[in-house]
């Protein structure tokens, strides 16, 4: 099972990136990086073609994350999927699951199942930031002596 976590962002932000984070994926980070290096900087459609045709087991969870990030872009920000590119991709090592394999004469061998965390950021090439009039300026923090400066 892949746990997909979505970053909560301000809907009025001027950022043109949308994220999807997959945590505790049962595979080595080294094997996931082999796939990630092939798709970094490519368009969304080209990435889907590459991931569907590559013969590696690591392609399936990465493909699900790319689909999830594109769904986030379409639903949350209203981006067009044809203009999305993969801007940032990161693979970090997760926790290692440790299991015992029983052996002869009461011994046991340790089995280590590595996990990894994959973050995918999609960027829209046709994104136009909001007008500066729509974004409210932050109020000035005058501190507790602000009333002295008024008079």
Swiss-Prot record:
Full protein name: Large ribosomal subunit protein uL22c
InterPro entries associated with the record: Ribosomal_uL22, Ribosomal_uL22_bac/chlpt-type, Ribosomal_uL22_bac/org-type, Ribosomal_uL22_CS, Ribosomal_uL22_sf
GO cellular component terms, A-Z: chloroplast; large ribosomal subunit
Role this protein plays: This protein binds specifically to 23S rRNA. The globular domain of the protein is located near the polypeptide exit tunnel on the outside of the subunit, while an extended beta-hairpin is found that lines the wall of the exit tunnel in the center of the 70S ribosome.
Organism: Gossypium barbadense (Sea Island cotton)
Family from the record: Belongs to the universal ribosomal protein uL22 family.
Single annotated GO MF: rRNA binding
Entry's Gene Ontology BP terms: translation
Protein's cellular compartments: Plastid, Chloroplast
Sorted UniProt keywords: Chloroplast, Plastid, Ribonucleoprotein, Ribosomal protein, RNA-binding, rRNA-binding
Assembly: Part of the 50S ribosomal subunit.
Gene3D superfamilies: Ribosomal protein L22/L17
NCBIfam families: rplV_bact
Entry superkingdom: Eukaryota
């Amino acid at each position: 099972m892949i746990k997909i976590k979505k970053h909560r962002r301000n809907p009025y932000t001027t950022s043109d990136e949308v994220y999807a984070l997959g945590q505790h994926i049962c595979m080595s980070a080294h094997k996931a990086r082999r796939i990630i290096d092939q798709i970094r900087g490519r368009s969304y459609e080209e990435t889907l073609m590459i991931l569907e045709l590559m013969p590696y087991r690591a392609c399936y969870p990465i493909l699900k994350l790319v689909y999830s990030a594109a769904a986030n872009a379409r639903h949350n920000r209203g981006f067009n999927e044809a203009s999305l590119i993969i801007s940032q991709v990161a693979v970090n090592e997760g926790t290692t699951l440790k299991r015992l394999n029983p052996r002869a004469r009461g011994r046991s061998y340790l089995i280590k199942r590595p996990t990894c965390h994959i973050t995918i950021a999609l960027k829209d090439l046709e994104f136009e930031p909001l007008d500066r009039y729509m974004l409210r300026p932050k109020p000035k923090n005058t501190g507790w002596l602000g009333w002295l400066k008024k008079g």
